[in-house]
Amino acid sequence: MFLLLLVIVSLAGCAALSGSEPAATPADFQVIGGGFVQRGLTFDHIVSGDAGCDDVNLARTAIGLDARGLDQATPTRLYIYLFRDQATFERLRQSVDSCAGSYATDPGTFESVEASPFVVAGPGPWAPQFRAAIRAAITEAAGSGG
């Protein structure tokens, strides 16, 4: 786990120093994870295919993890849905909200942010800086949205 985190931070650091424009195509989980780390978030208990519910189509796109950092002192489970492209995002986006009923025990505190073709969702409430860091990381990783 430490080695994975070190690789993500190293890659993110190199990208930050390159001064290049954001990618024109969506990035993968390593870039999103690096974006989280660059913005002061930490995460563990990463599970590929963990959509938070029994939706097979979402599970193919999902990664579940526990995250915290900045003003979010208590870890919270996040579900990251990495859709292949804009068309897949549009087709499956509403499924994320339906799936949330499985893990959001209080629908009033369900949180999500999206930047096509990505969605990050989970039980809340999320602290403001934490939410902003998630939004910034996935927006950067989304590039032009696939």
At which residue positions do the language-model features occur?
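Short, solvent-exposed recognition patches
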Residues: 30-105
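Bacterial signal peptide processing site
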Residues: 15-18
